[in-house]
């Protein structure tokens, strides 16, 4: 690993984590709203 990495690994990890949290959050929010409207 060179010290002049074009993209730091922690930035990749943070972006990936935020993406997963966003997708999971939208999924649960959508299912919650769907169940609420169907009742």
Swiss-Prot record:
Lineage top rank: taxon: Bacteria
First and last residue of the signal peptide: none
Keyword Thylakoid recorded: yes
SUPFAM superfamilies: Photosystem II reaction center protein J, PsbJ
InterPro entries in the record: PSII_PsbJ (IPR002682), PSII_PsbJ_sf (IPR037267)
Stretches that traverse the bilayer: 7-27
Keyword DNA damage: no
Record's keyword terms, sorted: Membrane, Photosynthesis, Photosystem II, Reaction center, Thylakoid, Transmembrane, Transmembrane helix
Entry membrane topology: Single-pass membrane protein
GO cellular component, one term: photosystem II reaction center
Record note on quaternary structure: PSII is composed of 1 copy each of membrane proteins PsbA, PsbB, PsbC, PsbD, PsbE, PsbF, PsbH, PsbI, PsbJ, PsbK, PsbL, PsbM, PsbT, PsbX, PsbY, PsbZ, Psb30/Ycf12, peripheral proteins PsbO, CyanoQ (PsbQ), PsbU, PsbV and a large number of cofactors. It forms dimeric complexes.
Role summary: One of the components of the core complex of photosystem II (PSII). PSII is a light-driven water:plastoquinone oxidoreductase that uses light energy to abstract electrons from H(2)O, generating O(2) and a proton gradient subsequently used for ATP formation. It consists of a core antenna complex that captures photons, and an electron transfer chain that converts photonic excitation into a charge separation.
Record protein name field: Photosystem II reaction center protein J
């Amino acid at each position: 690993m060179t010290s002049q990495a074009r993209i730091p690994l922690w930035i990749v990890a943070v972006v990936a984590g935020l993406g997963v949290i966003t997708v999971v959050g939208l999924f649960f929010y959508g299912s919650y709203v769907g169940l609420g409207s169907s009742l």
